[in-house]
């Protein structure tokens, strides 16, 4: 049982809460919209419906806000956000929407250009927020 890695200890009283939104990919892939653990809410990468990147951005933020509310948190408590876009040129049109969503509480952020699960999606957003 030796090895180079130390054992991992988990506090006995730590609870994990899983939040499902009923999204189509949750059951297909085997994940949930958000997990509350260790004082944080971890929201899975979230896409939104719509024809434009702006519509999809607003829809994704709405789904994220709903998950955070179910977890007892909010967009104001987001500490980290990652944006995934197939085309980085689509990011700038989202800036006013994102600035409005996070208002006076901007989180640390990263934007990554990459393919998404389906070509119809133009943006995916993943956040971590303080719980409670």
Question: Where do the protein language model's features map onto the residues?
Answer:
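Short, polar/acidic, helix-capping and beta-turn segments at strand->helix junctions
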Residues: 13-132
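Short, Lys/Arg-enriched N-terminal segments with co-localized hydrophobic residues
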Residues: 4-13
